[in-house]
Amino acid sequence: MASGIARGRLAEERKSWRKNHPHGFVAKPETGQDGTVNLMVWHCTIPGKAGTDWEGGFFPLTMHFSEDYPSKPPKCKFPQGFFHPNVYPSGTVCLSILNEDYGWRPAITVKQILVGIQDLLDTPNPADPAQTDGYHLFCQDPVEYKKRVKLQSKQYPALV
């Protein structure tokens, strides 16, 4: 029964996204070689916000939904080794709205999650670090931190 709820909600999310989504963002369910759509895994792209050190980057993110969605949040992952204070070395994003014990609410949409992650890129939360490297540079060497962010943004150009 729960999987029916999850898939139904994700089908609605997909329909809503296709009608209206923020410029530069991509979010689509995984499609198999045979054309089947897997609503439980979405491949997304988050653009770096204009006017920030992240501008120009288009960052790939995968959202993994469980059968308990929307009671439980999706797991959101950048590529392994992604540089950011609130991204674990595995690529998993550490954000309050993705924490089922803290900020998650079933009403939160895919669009809200992706925009929240875009905001997090330029405004890290030093109170909730997930990787030592990004955290230390952000806190102790802002010039080097900005350099690393700009370099990473160049590593993820637009795919057009």
UniProtKB/Swiss-Prot annotation:
It comes from the Eukaryota. SUPFAM superfamilies: UBC-like (SSF54495). The active site is at C94 (glycyl thioester intermediate). Pathway: Protein modification; protein sumoylation. Disruption phenotype: Embryonic lethal. Its EC number is 2.3.2.-. PROSITE patterns: UBC_1 (PS00183), UBC_2 (PS50127). GO terms for cellular component: cytosol; nucleus. SMART domains: UBCc. Keywords: Acetylation, ATP-binding, Nucleotide-binding, Transferase, Ubl conjugation pathway. GO terms for molecular function: ATP binding; kinase binding; SUMO binding; SUMO transferase activity. Residues 5-158 form the UBC core domain. It holds the Pfam family UQ_con. GO terms for biological process: embryo development ending in seed dormancy; protein sumoylation; response to abscisic acid. The modification N-acetylalanine is found at A2. InterPro entries: Ub_conjugating_enzyme, UBQ-conjugat_E2_core, UBQ-conjugating_AS, UBQ-conjugating_enzyme/RWD. Coiled coil: none annotated. SUMO-conjugating enzyme that accepts the SUMO proteins from the E1 SUMO-activating heterodimer SAE1/SAE2 and catalyzes its covalent attachment to other proteins with the E3 SUMO ligases SIZ1 and MMS21. Associates with SIZ1 for sumoylation of the transcription factor GTE3. Interacts with SIZ1 (via PHD domain) and MMS21. Interacts with TCP14 and TCP15. Interacts with KIN10. Belongs to the ubiquitin-conjugating enzyme family. PANTHER family: UBIQUITIN-CONJUGATING ENZYME E2. This is SUMO-conjugating enzyme SCE1. It comes from Arabidopsis thaliana. The lineage of its organism: Eukaryota, Viridiplantae, Streptophyta, Embryophyta, Tracheophyta.
